[in-house]
């Protein structure tokens, strides 16, 4: 049995455990996580379905511009999609733009989970939740975290068994963008922060337009935006993810509890207080609580946690569930 299939079996066992705990009154808190996993389909659908339906249109419109630019350095146009999170349109857009399937998987599942998630989720959401006086620590942590993205992309690609030359060439645009973002955070931090917030709002507008147009077309048969994929294509993906998350959240709760002591010990050795050490563990499931905890962390903990969330956000949570739903064979490289 491959590791990917092993993970799916673990998630399946999580479904049974969570379901039983829900039946018997949520005695261990796993029944609640069972519900939480299934209920996450709503937010996921809001963030994903619109861009899934628009992906063919975006690829058709931007393709003539993007393809020649990326071909100049020998990179696959799919790498353009890494500016979006994997579960917020990065994956479907990458696969639409991809000239090589492996490059599409590298971009849409591995790199987008780090770079795209940072651009469209971690920065705008984090800035909205952390205290204003913590922004310098947040920026410093992002600066450190961004440097890990090319390394993570290369390692993930090699674990997936992709051709090393293909991986390295396609990392060139990622390295360039990571360096530009890092330089921006050093020299023009306010402009970078404002730009990230504006970009995040723009993505929400695009996603909403796609969702509304696709829903209208489904209900009436009237096409507003020609070339869109049917809304059901996106909803099928969401359903697949929801089934996996039924088991992911209960299992994740058990994993986080098991890892809590060793990771807390590591955190304390790195010089963080208890809150900072706890943030390292929680990020693996969901980074949103960590932003709210930052006000109680010491300065070192704030920087380390922000750097950690760039490659690690939801690695054992939504990103694991999403990958298992769309490409189970890519679970190991993504994680």
Question: Where are the language model's segments positioned?
Answer:
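Transmembrane alpha-helix boundary signature
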Residues: 53-61, 94-101, 158-161, 219-224
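Interfacial/capping segments of alpha-helical transmembrane domains
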Residues: 58-76
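Signature of multi-pass transmembrane helix bundles
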Residues: 1-50, 107-115, 120-251, 255, ...
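Alpha-helical membrane segments and immediately flanking helix-loop junctions
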Residues: 73-151, 273-328
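Interfacial helix-start motif at the membrane-water boundary
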Residues: 46-53, 81-83
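Transmembrane alpha-helix/helix-exit interface in multi-pass inner-membrane proteins
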Residues: 52, 56, 249, 253-266
């Amino acid at each position: 049995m491959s590791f990917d299939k092993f993970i799916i079996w673990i998630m399946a066992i999580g479904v049974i455990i969570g379901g039983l705990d829900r039946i018997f009154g949520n005695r261990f808190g796993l029944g609640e996580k069972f519900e939480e996993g299934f209920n996450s389909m709503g937010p996921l659908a809001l963030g994903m379905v619109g861009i899934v339906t628009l992906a063919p249109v975006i690829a058709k419109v931007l393709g003539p511009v993007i393809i020649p630019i990326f071909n100049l350095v020998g990179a696959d146009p799919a790498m353009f999609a890494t500016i979006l999170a994997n579960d917020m349109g990065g994956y479907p857009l990458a696969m639409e733009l991809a000239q090589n399937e492996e490059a599409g998987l590298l971009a849409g599942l591995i790199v987008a989970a780090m770079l795209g998630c940072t651009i469209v989720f971690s920065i705008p959401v984090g800035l909205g939740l952390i205290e204003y006086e913590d922004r310098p620590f947040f920026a410093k942590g992002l600066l450190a975290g961004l440097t890990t993205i090319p390394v993570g992309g290369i390692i993930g690609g090699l674990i997936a068994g992709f051709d090393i030359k293909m991986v390295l060439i396609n990392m060139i645009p990622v390295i360039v963008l990571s360096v530009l973002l890092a330089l921006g955070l050093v020299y023009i931090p306010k402009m970078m922060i404002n730009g990230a917030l504006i970009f995040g709002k723009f993505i929400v507008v695009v996603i909403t337009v796609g969702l509304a147009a696709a829903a209208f077309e489904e209900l009436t048969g009237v096409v507003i935006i020609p070339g869109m994929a049917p809304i059901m294509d996106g909803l099928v993906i969401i359903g697949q993810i929801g089934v996996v998350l039924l088991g992911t959240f209960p299992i994740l709760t058990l994993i986080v509890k098991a890892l809590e002591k060793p990771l807390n010990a590591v955190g304390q050795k790195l010089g963080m207080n208890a809150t900072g050490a706890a943030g390292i563990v929680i990020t693996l499931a969901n980074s949103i609580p960590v932003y709210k905890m930052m006000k109680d962390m010491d300065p070192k903990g704030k920087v380390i946690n922000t750097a950690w969330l760039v490659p690690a956000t939801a690695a054992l949570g939504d990103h694991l569930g999403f990958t298992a739903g769309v490409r189970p064979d890519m679970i190991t490289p993504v994680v």
